[in-house]
Design a protein with these regions (language model features):
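Non-catalytic ligand/cofactor/substrate-binding and regulatory segments of enzyme domains
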Residues: 1-91, 98-112
Length: 114
């Protein structure tokens, strides 16, 4: 079992607009989707973003291997080319990954972007 967190960062867009970016932390890795496609990295602070909120979404029984295979399956929808800041973005990706992880208590995380 692994704990699942929704991370919400803020960042400057066009130097005058502040936007939010979401990531999922599970199996001690941060999984995100952005203008570079899907990224998976060790859990750490982001240099270009400020961590605003961490929401505990529950625990999952999905293994690291199963999650990796799932990400390989959905990567065709979340490529660098398919990224759209306001439609096909980190929030949509985070919601889909949270649903796949089927956490035992992910209702609060789903409320944010459902």
């Amino acid at each position: 079992m692994s704990e699942v967190y929704l991370l919400i960062y803020t960042f400057k867009f066009l130097q005058f607009l502040t936007l939010e970016h979401t990531e999922i932390r599970v199996h001690e890795r941060d999984i995100a989707y952005g203008r570079h496609g899907i990224t998976v990295s060790p859990s750490e602070d982001r240099e270009d973003m400020i961590l605003k909120t961490i929401i505990f979404c529950g625990t999952t029984e999905v293994t690291d291997l199963d999650l990796t295979q799932y990400l390989m399956h959905i990567h065709v929808f979340f490529t660098k080319k398919n990224y759209q800041l306001f439609t096909n973005n980190c929030r949509k990706f985070s919601t889909i990954v949270l649903r796949y992880l089927d956490t035992d208590d992910n209702e609060e995380g789903n409320k944010i972007y459902a």
